[in-house]
């Protein structure tokens, strides 16, 4: 009897393992040898019976290899297929197309945490295949706006300029605007290492098990991919991170899949496993370039700078998958990273991204050239949902007032610095001298911190008060009198 049970368990395990890796689409399948043309990443087939939009197909090549594709456009009996692994080697004589009859789905399991996948969702860490608990459509299910919960409760990143002045709340989508040569990878990795829930009164679950990071990389080089993977492993954070890596030498079209697969994983962990998921997507500029390549191959009418006219709505299908839902404790917070071509914030990619997302964090080249890390310029940075996640019972009662005062003083100090270059330091007033002192200490003490330095929100606020004490009380007009009387003295009570 015991032997029969063992055999049954072994058989069940084998069947489950096969189910995780097999092509689970409908059977029998139709096969077509009617490839009429190959253009860039696209393959055109003719005489197809009832082709369906977004249907997944398998292309069999003459060397017995297979490639996956997706029907991108249907016109009568003609279908245009977008091939994920590239079209080199596909011909119209020996290659044929097998139609599945289903859309692209991703096997999901909480075992995906701690694993590394390629841009198509296949394991590349030499580990076993995922035993799926469920198969989910990578395009996700639209969230009823009526069922959305307003984002609140702050996520602590350990970086003072973000936590104090551009606070990120659970369920928010806020991008990092960077440029070529700036340390956005280091900032992204640091946030991945340090991100956690603020230990406030309203946080029900303080354990790290309730927090996960999904990292999707698009078009990164081998060095960057190795850096992220090695950083997570060395700092013991890998077990709470799920990595999807599309390298620069991987097919360009795969970059269109990568963010959707990453977000599908995040939705499963957030809404099925009720975890708080922090999603980092880098680099969204590579995604937009892949979108432009497909649009060009389809000979569509180009929009600004050659990007397709529908790029705004396409980006929204990615960014709008962040948020919280009624009846679920989990949340998805998005932190996409994009590099602005030629440092141009008016470029279509950052321009359209800024319309959709709830603020932005700006990485500044001038600060970086002065060896300030992280080189985050707080003046063009903004978090539109910051007010709902800070203050009494969430961080500290003085948080919003300190943030406003820091912004005000830093902006005035920049004006004084520009005026000093014109009229000289001798012509400045005593108040102007205080602002210049504040500017110097703000950049050296508040903005600057070590790559592995994790400041909690209370440490960052205390540093901010040290800087504000440069000024007499009557110059701190953004802070209420009762807050000043409590926190302005050097030995204040928390």
Swiss-Prot record:
One GO CC term on file: proton-transporting V-type ATPase, V1 domain
CDD domains per UniProt: ATP-synt_V_A-type_beta_C, ATP-synt_V_A-type_beta_N, V_A-ATPase_B
Keyword Repressor: no
InterPro entries according to UniProt: ATP-synt_VA_C (IPR055190), ATPase_a/bsu_AS (IPR020003), ATPase_F1/V1/A1_a/bsu_N (IPR004100), ATPase_F1/V1/A1_a/bsu_nucl-bd (IPR000194), ATPase_V1-cplx_bsu (IPR005723), P-loop_NTPase (IPR027417), V-ATPase_su_B/beta (IPR022879)
Keywords noted in UniProt: Hydrogen ion transport, Ion transport, Transport
Domain of life where this protein originates: Eukaryota
GO MF annotations in UniProt: ATP binding; proton-transporting ATPase activity, rotational mechanism
Record-level GO BP terms: ATP metabolic process; vacuolar acidification
Subunit structure: V-ATPase is a heteromultimeric enzyme composed of a peripheral catalytic V1 complex (main components: subunits A, B, C, D, E, and F) attached to an integral membrane V0 proton pore complex (main component: the proteolipid protein).
Function: Non-catalytic subunit of the peripheral V1 complex of vacuolar ATPase. V-ATPase is responsible for acidifying a variety of intracellular compartments in eukaryotic cells.
NCBIfam families assigned to the protein according to its UniProt record, in alphabetical order: PRK04196.1, V-ATPase_V1_B
Family in the record: Belongs to the ATPase alpha/beta chains family.
Protein name as catalogued: V-type proton ATPase subunit B
Species in which this protein is naturally found: Plasmodium falciparum
